[in-house]
Regions:
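A surface-exposed beta-strand-loop module
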Residues: 56-122, 147, 180-181, 188
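Hydrophobic helix-coil surface modules that form long, contiguous segments used
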Residues: 35, 132-137, 144-305, 334
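Glycine/proline-rich low-complexity spacer/linker segments in large multi-domain proteins
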Residues: 5-12, 94, 103-156, 205-214
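Beta-strand elements of well-folded, non-transmembrane domains
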Residues: 26-28, 39-45, 106-108, 161-163
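N-terminal, polar/Ser/Thr-rich
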Residues: 1-34, 69, 124-129, 149
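Short edge-strand/loop segments of extracellular domains
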Residues: 55-58, 117-129, 264-269
Length: 336
């Protein structure tokens, strides 16, 4: 499906992203976040504006730099109804490679989509973690982006968080650095494969991980809030056998570098197939195999297998537009 110039629901194809470098700092007390990003873009024809998706964000700084080093400052105009931002520049952008820089702020919402807050109760009181749910069109609530599945790009994420918290994203940690005098750390993750925005994920909070097991060359772990690690063994066993089976069945190696399965206390769907960081509702991942019913075990096994099937069919190979989602889900259901 190739959108025409008057299509009100699709982004223009004049500019497309190649690589995002995103730095986000969530504040779990104020329930806000700040962000900066640098996006390598390809300009395909002369334009004076760049149109991308943004929702519930405030864009404070805009600039773009050419391959020769020339920099233009721009202004952002937000279109709330269309969930778009128009970045307007004083001179036309020539065709070629440019680097777009943006600074922005947002809110950790309580609506279980975008970059949101998840709450849970402990003997010490209520706790909060920050999690993401981007399918179908909610990555734009975490950072300005080309939030359509056909606009695949590489993502490199840096999360800034208190040193006592755990941070997880799609790829392994590439570096971790303490920010002197702040009690915070900056964790940078390895670049992803080229993928759609809706498959990016990150979680920040008090988390515990199961002992990793190796499935071929892939480390696999289950993450949960503290005190629930004893409920991860069944899902880990199912995940390991599913991952090994699908690698053999598809005849293609798993496309990620690691596989984390994360149980989120507040989660709208059953699970979400973020590449390398699959998020789940707790009841779809955590189970006491010795006390659970057959139906409960079958439910966990089905959901885990379904999401791992998506790592190839949906993540590695993705529909160009949402009218193809039926095949994405139908094939994963068949492969359960």
């Amino acid at each position: 499906m190739n959108p025409g110039p008057a299509d009100p629901f699709r982004l223009p194809r004049t500019v497309s992203p190649e690589r995002y470098e995103i730095r986000l700092e969530p504040d779990l007390e104020r329930l806000t976040f700040t962000g900066q990003e640098m996006v390598t873009v390809i300009v395909r024809e002369r334009v004076t504006e760049v149109v991308l998706n943004a929702a519930e964000l405030q864009i404070q700084q805009v600039s773009i730099r050419s391959a020769t080093g020339a920099t233009l400052k721009g202004e952002a105009t937000l279109e709330e109804a269309g969930e778009r931002a128009r970045l307007i520049f004083p001179e036309p952008l020539a065709p070629g490679t440019w680097r777009l820089s943006l600074a922005f702020t947002g809110i950790l919402n309580d609506r279980l989509h975008g970059f949101y807050r998840s709450t849970y109760k402990t003997p010490e009181g209520e706790k909060i973690l920050a999690a993401t749910q981007f399918e179908a069109t909610d990555a734009r609530r975490a950072f300005p982006c080309w939030d359509e599945p056909a606009f695949k790009a590489v993502f490199q994420v840096t999360l800034v968080a208190p040193e006592r918290l755990q941070v997880v994203s799609n790829t392994p940690v590439a570096s971790e650095q303490a920010i002197v005098g702040t009690g915070r750390k900056a964790v940078t993750f390895a670049p992803t494969i080229k993928m759609s925005t809706y498959l990016l994920a990150f979680v920040v909070g008090e988390l515990e991980a199961s002992e990793p097991i190796m499935v071929g060359l892939t480390p696999l772990r289950i993450w949960s809030i503290p005190g629930k690690t004893h409920l991860t063994a069944f899902a880990r066993e199912i995940a390991a056998s599913s991952l090994a089976f699908f690698e053999q069945y598809y005849g293609l190696p798993y496309p990620g570098e690691k596989l984390d399965l994360l149980a989120i206390p507040d989660f709208a769907a059953g699970a979400m197939e973020n590449l390398g960081a699959i998020t789940f509702r707790e009841t779809a991942l955590l189970v006491d195999a010795g006390a659970a019913s057959h139906a409960e075990l079958e439910r966990v096994a089905d959901v885990v297998a379904h999401e791992i099937a998506h790592m190839w069919f949906g993540d590695l190979v993705t529909m160009a537009w949402w009218n193809g989602i039926w095949l994405n889900e139908a094939f994963a259901t068949f492969m359960e």
